[in-house]
Amino acid sequence: MAYRTFILSAVSALALSGCAVGPDRVSPSPPSPSATSGPFLSAQTDIVTANPLPQDWWRLYEDPVLDGLVADALGANTDIRQAVARMDRARAALRGARSDRLPTVGLTASAAYSRTPEFETPPGADRTGTGISLGADVSYEVDLFGRVSGQISASRNDLAAAQADADAVRVMVVADTTLAYANAASAAARIDVARSIVALLDDSLRLTRRRHEVGMADGLAVARIQSLRDQRAATIPEIEAQRSAALFALATLTGRTPAELPAISGERSIPLEIAAPLPVGDGTQLLARRPDVRAAEQRLLADTDRIGVARADLYPRITLGGSVGSSASS
């Protein structure tokens, strides 16, 4: 009868283990798709689409050199490795929190040897003896007020926040690499245009000088074209410096020195363009893609869970335990 009462009590305690005392989560309702897609598609529907943006969005440029630079940057960035290490730490904390749901088992073992003095030993009796004892203790915390489940949920949200932080670093690295490559290509294109204009102005200057020599143009026309030519030529070193800065940034992002940067990285002289319409999705998808928003949401959920854990600590902890042992001597 006592054993049956114990079993019923244990089952009742387990049934009540869902009585968490933490605050309820209230998630904001997402806006309707019609309210969020309009601002993105009302201007020019042939430029953007409502399709979701792919994770490897830089491949939309269809540039193998850019793909290789992004892969190198992701592999060389130390901030990403640190973010991954923080994810591993959060994952280990989650495993530790989940282990609190399992019973705790302790094993004990002992052995003893004894020898009785001869004057205390009856005739014919053995003077030596050995003893062995084994035991096991089992304890289990009944999660009556949600302390254990709250810790698990908080650790799970911490892991999700760490994953979002790692995604944010990856997004930043990819964006910086793509921007540096685009700036280098754009600067190269501007240099080509500036040099072409200078060449045209040189031809115009030669023709104007000849006309001036035969009296068909005055000196003011020659001076004006010369000034335009010099002004345009003066912009070339500035643009070349911008291109060099972009290539230096690419070298830094990919973990190389400027001298080690492959020459092919700076050969493109055509600005980057996306041939197909740009998939942007809607406002809800845009917010869902932002890692900083996801990280903030997960940290808020983790803090909410910890409020419940703190409240559960104010209540008694219920632990079920049992032990068994055996001993033998000879």
Protein language model annotation of sequence segments:
Residues 81, 101-128, 139-168, 187-188, ...:
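Small/polar (Gly/Ser/Thr/Ala-rich) solvent-exposed segments
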Residues 148, 157, 164-282:
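Periplasmic alpha-helical coiled-coil/stalk elements that build and connect Gram-negative outer-membrane
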Residues 239, 291-292, 298:
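Metallo-beta-lactamase
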Residues 295-315:
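Long hydrophobic segments that form regular secondary structure
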Residues 134-138:
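Membrane-embedded beta-strands of outer-membrane beta-barrel proteins
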Residues 2-75, 132, 156, 240-288:
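Terminal intrinsically disordered/low-complexity segments used for targeting and assembly
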Residues 85, 89-92:
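Membrane-embedded segments
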